Amino acid sequence: MIIPWQELEEETLNNIVESFILREGTDYGQCELSLEQKKQALLSQIQQGTVVIVWSELHESIDIKDKMDLLK
């Protein structure tokens, strides 16, 4: 189930984003970005709708997924 980011409290959204970044160890290219820079980049993607926050009832977990991957 997709969770609309606009319905989340700011602190909750920030915690989800930070948890995702720390869990994924996402590669941001040749230059290393700070946690804050990574958070801002991911928040921007969420607000633009290119990625979405997803709740899995089966696994009882929350994740951030590329919207195009969900449409496949």
Curated annotation (Swiss-Prot):
| Recorded superkingdom | Bacteria
* Record family assignment: Belongs to the UPF0270 family.
Q: Which organism is it from?
A: Pasteurella multocida (strain Pm70)
Which SUPFAM superfamilies does the entry mention?
YehU-like (SSF118001)
Q: Which InterPro entries match?
A: UPF0270 (IPR010648), YehU-like_sf (IPR036685)
Under NCBIfam families, the record lists: PRK04966.1 (NF003438)
Q: Which residues form the signal peptide?
A: none
Full protein name: UPF0270 protein PM1156
* Any matching Pfam family: UPF0270
